[in-house]
Structures are given as C-alpha cells and as structure tokens.
Amino acid sequence: IYKEVVYFDIKGQEKFKISEINDKKLDLSQKNNTYIKAESYFEDIKSLKEGEIYVSDVIGAYVGSKIIGTFTKEKTKKSSLAFRPELHGYAGKENPLGKRFEAIVRFITPVFSQGKKVGYISLALDHRHIMEYTDTVNPVKEHKQDIADASVGNYAFMWNFEGQNISHPRDYFIVGYNENTGEKVPGWVSADVQKQYQESKSKSLHEFLKTYPKFEEQSLTKKPNLKQLKQKGELGLDCRYLNFAPQCQGWMQVTENGGYGSFIIYWSKVWKLTTAATIPYYTGKYKNTKRGFGFVTIGANVDEFHSAANKTKMKIEEV
C-alpha cells in the first residue's frame, strides 16, 4: 500500500526509513530532497498537534502524450511522430504500452514524548491504489474491468477538491509535476487563454495562471489550445482553466455542498450522462471543503446507459 514509511526528527532529518523511492536518509527540510522535489510540507507540519494528520495533494511526475485516443501508426504518421507508444502516457486499451503515472499521497503525524514533540511519522501512499477505484469501473457493466477503455466513452475518473484531475484512464490527463524542477506542469487550456498568456509576456504559463480567473465563461464554443498537444504533449486536466469543457463548471456546482448529482452533456459528438459524487474524507486541509478529498465523475454514453430499457421498450411495442 505504501511506497515509503519514515520517521524523521523535528529538524527534518530522517532517522528510520523503509522506502521504494530513495533508501538514503535525507534532510526533508530541504525541498529538493522531497519526492520529485515537489513537496513543501515541512513548514506546514510544525503546527500539527498530537493526533493531527497532514495530508498532501497527489504528487507525481507528469506523463504527457502527443496523441489523444487510440495510439495508432496512422495517427503518429499524421502527426509526424515515430510510432513509439512507450514514450507517451499510458491510456488503458488505447495505449497499454505507455508510461504510467506514478504518484504518492503523503500522510504525516507528529510523535510526542512526555508531552514534547520529538519527530514525525510519514507514510507515502501509492497512488495506484487510488486509481484502482476508478480504472476498474465501467458504468454500463456490472462487473469490474481489468483495463479501462476510454474510447467507448464509459469510464470513471477523479478530481481533487479544486478541480484538478487525479485519476483517469488516460494517464496523460492527470495533473502532475516536472520531476526536474518540482514545479506543477500547467494544465491544458483553451486557445483564448493561450493567446492572453502570450500577450501577457509572463515568463511561464504556470505563473500566468496563478492570477488568471478560474472557470471563465466556459463554453463548447471555445477551442482547445492545440499547441500544448502538438508541441509539448501537456494535457493535464485542470477544470479551473479548461474553458472549452463547460461540464467542469457543472461538476463543481453539483459538488459545491457535498453529495452528488447528474446531468446530460453533449461531448465528443455523443450525448453522455455524467454523474459526480464527492469523496467524504475530511482530514487535514480537506476538512475545509465540503467536497472533502475531491469527487468522482462517471461518464456513460446515454444510448448504452439506456440500452436495457430501450430493448424492453421495443419488445413491448412488438406485442
């Protein structure tokens, strides 16, 4: 379940460690020594009281793809790419040879001795176990599946409470970090946002988005920024800036006060029933939002979803 179990002292120095990530004992007060240089928990955990738990975001290196959907020789040829599926993000049946998104969720709690804080216990949950909740689900089939197939439009995926994707059959849609810098890789944006970014002279899209309005006039009339796909293959889904996907705003509204809800959308030339349900986990920073850890969304082709009822209707009409 865990990629790492560590005890470190109040200065951040690891004392006892079992790890699949790095078996060297490190000084965790230095961000460069944390997982893919992306964790900044050391200052946050200083205020933890006895029994309290720090819970991180999903932390993992982004895996991109310059091909969306089934990875074929025809598509790579059209995009002037070599047919090397292993160099692009994993996508279930669409690209079973692709690079997997690997990540952790870190849990930290303080250790006290005679009323004095002396160190911390840290557990790094393997994100694979979170993905198994959604990758094994097909909303139009009764049994769990071994491998997801997003091409048919029937699948489940997961978002954090802010609307960033943390689990998807297409791993390249999961928001992640640059493993060399520890900086979050910006999500896929609409073409109009890309234009404003270029006009802003900001040093990076990541910096530009820090001050850009969230969920700005999301509409199907807006188009995706194809430069991100063709040039960088950076397609992480961050609902806050995915302005060509208005269902994002719908999911956020449905889950705003916790609970769940459904609506129908027209997406990729198919009518789909989409359902969003919050994840009631309220430990650490997740106690501050009614969405808890985030929410799961399930999308199903409307015709397939109602296929059993439609067949019954046809039989009745034949009588």
Give the location of each predicted region.
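Solvent-exposed, extracytoplasmic
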Residues: K31, Y35-I36, Y41-D44, Y90-L97, ...
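PAS/PAS-like sensory domains
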Residues: L48-D57, F83-L87, E256-F263
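Generic short beta-strand
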Residues: V5, R106-T109, A156, F263
